[in-house]
Structures are given as structure tokens and as C-alpha cells.
């Protein structure tokens, strides 16, 4: 028996910081009628260099908090959490916490479309250290498209640059160029580049500037949204458990005013933010 309410509720979106706001934005563009709760564990961000166990523990706490807030379905809008915690939560925790609830990630929806996008069959992944070390993209892509070669490069400075509101500085330009040059040097045949961290679309103008025109750049928001739409279509029982009033609540583990200010980098609208502690 579940310890949580079985009443219909909002869709939860979790990220270690602000990057998941790009996922939430993509989802709301396609599915505006649903209710959402966004939870950012900003006080403990970034997750990229943390161990598998720590990321799992933090992500589990966040998922439980969203369940307690009424969410029947939670999207891990964080690549590191999707890479390091999703499987354990799906296989070990959900059967005990509530077998009817669902937790989905952002890596699988991206992997599903890659084989349709690349012509050279050479794909690059720019992501956090944790996501690259997990080999999650390589495993998921090659499970679906075994003829695709995947090259991954960690970009450890990109998230701090974005969260410090320095995306438009010469320093950002320098570090973006350095990583792109490196990945294209490793595999010059890459024709599709995945932004494997939900923060990275903020750097899109700089990334596009340094990537050859024939290389397409894949940001995740659109594909995660389409995947969620398809999931709800295929699971009408879950779709009926998601409320629809077009509302959004924002929760953060840090100072709400700081979150409100920094969220403007990612979404151009005024947000009301509540503080929450994860235990």
C-alpha cells in the first residue's frame, strides 16, 4: 500500500539547479494545460562531480518530496540524476514507495531520436563529468542504434559560468570554443552534437558560433516534451492522474529570492518561489 495520496496531482520536474527549467519550458510549450511542480536542489548543486551514491541519495530525497507534494509522475530534468540515479529509483524504490507512480529521465528520449538525426553515424555528447563518466549516452544510443559512434567530452566549467550569469562574457566564449575544438578533434566526423546537460542551451549562441554549419546541435527540451506527450498518450491511466489547471509551483532548497533572480536567465517570466528542505 502506498504511503502517498492517490489523488490526481501535478507533474514534477526535478533538477540539481536551474537547467531543468529549460526542460520545463519545453514541456509547457507542448503541454500547457497540465499542472507542474519544479524542484531545484540549488543549495547542493552542482551534481556533476558527485559520486553515484550521493547523487542517488539526493535524487531520491527530491523524488520523495515531489511525491509528498502530490506528483504522480516525476521527470528527472537533470542528466546527472538520470545517469546516476534513475535506474535505482525505478527498480529499487518505486516498487516499495508506490508501484503506481512513475519517474522518467531525459537521456532515453534524446537517445531515441539520435539515429534519425545523424547521417555520418558519428555523434558527440557535451555534458557534466558525472554524465560522461557514467557512459549513459553511449549505452542508451548504442542500445537503439548500434551503428552510431558516440564521443563524449566533459565541460566542467559550463554550469558555473551559466549559474554565475556569465554566459555572455569573453571567458564563456573561450571555454565553449575550447571544448568544441576538443570534441571535433577527437572525432572530426561528428555531424550531431548533443547538449547533454539541461543548462547548456543557455550557451547556444556561443556553441553555434564555434560549431561548423553542417553539425546539428540537439537540445533536449523539445524531445523530452514530445516523449512525455507520447508517454501520456500511451498510458491514459497516468494521464488521468495528472491535473490540468495550467499552474506551476517552484520549489528550491536555497534562498527563494536568489532562485527567483537566477531563474530569469532560463525563463523570461516572473516566478513565485517556495523554500523546501530535502531530507
Question: Model segments located where?
Answer:
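Non-catalytic structural scaffold of enzyme domains
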Residues: 1-279
